[in-house]
Amino acid sequence: LKCNKLVPLF
């Protein structure tokens, strides 16, 4: 998926 500013989403 896309990496969020707070937490990396896989």
Curated annotation (Swiss-Prot):
Tissue expression remark: Expressed by the venom gland.
Gene Ontology BP terms: killing of cells of another organism
A single GO molecular function term of this UniProt record: toxin activity
Record bears the keyword Secreted: yes
Superkingdom assignment: Eukaryota
Main location class: secreted
GO cellular component, one term: extracellular region
Transmembrane annotation, as ranges: none
Subcellular location: Secreted; Target cell membrane
Keywords attached to this entry: Cardiotoxin, Cytolysis, Membrane, Secreted, Target cell membrane, Target membrane, Toxin
Family, similarity comment: Belongs to the three-finger toxin family. Short-chain subfamily. Type IA cytotoxin sub-subfamily.
Function: Shows cytotoxic activity against Ehrlich ascites carcinoma (EAC) model in mice. Also shows effect on apoptotic features such as nuclear fragmentation, caspase activity, pro- and anti-apoptotic protein levels on treated EAC cells. Increased levels of antioxidant enzymes and cytokine levels observed in toxin-treated EAC mice. Cardiotoxic towards guinea pig auricle. Has no cytotoxicity towards macrophages in vivo in EAC bearing mice or in vitro in normal human lymphocytes.
Subunit structure: Monomer in solution; Homodimer and oligomer in the presence of negatively charged lipids forming a pore with a size ranging between 20 and 30 Angstroms.
Official protein name in the record: Cytotoxin NN-32
